[in-house]
């Protein structure tokens, strides 16, 4: 690793657990600790703890905070109450995606945006560029926060053992500020990127650093493990959650990517609104579908998809599922071919191999 890679405040902590690190968008982060499969299974059946301190935090404050965010974001920010989080997209005028993110409402004039690590500067610049006449302060506070995610069916039990706050009262996509966890005050959000129940904890770097070991110690007897980026990707993919740069990008709209639930075309105008309305009215040119290999092989990001010799799209994410060993992927293809059960081909090392479109998500937790 070169010295140029950024490290999170937890780097020294997770190094103690045998982390194998990789360059992830300029950050030196753990791809795995034991193995991707073991960590994936732990999160599905018990719980895993992730360092997600590389994610960005941008604060928006001021009397025009709501109006500014309504213009900036695709979801309807007016619908969330204080203490509630909302998944949304930030779009360009052409409907392409600047980023997908979470909006946390701290107060009527105070919002926290959690953005993707690779997009922090781009998002911040885009927000400043579109501040216009709005009376708001936009503050990139990414360095002031660290963040960990405790994910899995045992997440609530483990977290509850460390705090007197009733965490069962924090419902999905709700959060509570100033929760004291073993003496460390943090924001606790019931949310995540795995398809499981879980919590994301935001706080000062020194507090989150201290909590990393304490949470793992508390969960050790229950089989809770440190988890890396490798299983974070297989978990989110299996659950049908998009990854910016693969399922979403400046050239892929939120409607094409299947996150139309985060786009409210009937609210007041927002950046990208007209382009997305036109897409919906004229029919989406492309759709994201699930694919499964018929022939032997594993679909990978960037592989081209063909129908009767004609290129119709490409794979956005693909892998062998750790749980079921199915060789599956997401592919963005011409809409006319997006019906379930349609056979097509993907090109792997110069060979065209058969795939079929299938239902997604590949995993849905039982409530």
From Swiss-Prot:
One of its GO terms (biological process) is glycine decarboxylation via glycine cleavage system. One of its GO terms (molecular function) is transaminase activity. Pfam families: GCV_T, GCV_T_C. It catalyses: N(6)-[(R)-S(8)-aminomethyldihydrolipoyl]-L-lysyl-[protein] + (6S)-5,6,7,8-tetrahydrofolate = N(6)-[(R)-dihydrolipoyl]-L-lysyl-[protein] + (6R)-5,10-methylene-5,6,7,8-tetrahydrofolate + NH4(+). SUPFAM superfamilies: Aminomethyltransferase beta-barrel domain, Folate-binding domain. The glycine cleavage system is composed of four proteins: P, T, L and H. Belongs to the GcvT family. This is Aminomethyltransferase. It comes from Lysinibacillus sphaericus (strain C3-41). The lineage of its organism: Bacteria, Bacillati, Bacillota, Bacilli, Bacillales.
């Amino acid at each position: 690793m070169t010295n140029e890679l950024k490290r999170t405040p937890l780097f020294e902590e997770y190094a103690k657990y045998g982390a194998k690190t990789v360059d992830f968008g300029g950050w030196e982060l753990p791809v795995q600790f034991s193995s991707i499969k073991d960590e994936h299974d732990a999160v599905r059946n018990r719980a895993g703890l992730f360092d997600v301190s590389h994610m960005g935090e941008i604060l928006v404050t001021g009397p025009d905070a709501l109006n500014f965010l309504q213009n900036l974001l695709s979801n309807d920010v007016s619908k969330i109450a204080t203490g509630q989080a909302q998944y949304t997209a930030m779009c360009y005028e052409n409907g392409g995606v600047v980023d997908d993110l979470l909006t946390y409402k701290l107060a009527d004039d105070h919002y926290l945006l959690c953005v993707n690590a690779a997009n922090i500067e781009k998002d911040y610049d885009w927000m400043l560029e579109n501040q216009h006449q709005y009376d708001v302060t936009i503050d990139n506070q990414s360095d002031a926060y660290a963040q960990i995610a405790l994910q899995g069916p045992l997440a609530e039990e483990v977290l509850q053992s460390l705090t007197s706050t009733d965490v069962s009262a924090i419902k999905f996509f709700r959060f509570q500020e100033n929760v004291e966890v073993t003496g460390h005050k943090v924001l606790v959000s019931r949310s995540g990127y795995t398809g499981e129940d879980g919590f994301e904890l935001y706080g000062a770097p020194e507090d989150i650093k201290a909590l990393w070991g304490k949470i793992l110690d508390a969960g050790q007897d229950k089989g809770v493990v440190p988890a890396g980026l490798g299983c974070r990707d297989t978990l989110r993919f299996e659950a049908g959650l998009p990854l910016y740069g693969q399922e979403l990008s400046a050239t892929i709209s939120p409607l094409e990517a299947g996150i139309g639930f985060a786009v409210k075309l009937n609210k007041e105008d927002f950046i990208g609104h007209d382009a997305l309305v036109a897409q919906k009215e004229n029919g989406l040119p492309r759709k994201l579908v699930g694919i499964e290999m018929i022939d032997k092989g594993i679909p990978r990001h960037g592989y081209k998809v063909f129908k009767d010799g004609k290129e119709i799209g490409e794979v956005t994410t693909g892998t062998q599922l750790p749980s079921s060993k199915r060789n599956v992927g997401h592919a963005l293809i011409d809409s006319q071919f997006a019906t379930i059960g349609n056979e097509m081909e993907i090109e792997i090392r110069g060979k065209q191999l058969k795939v079929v479109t299938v239902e997604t998500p590949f995993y849905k937790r039982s409530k």
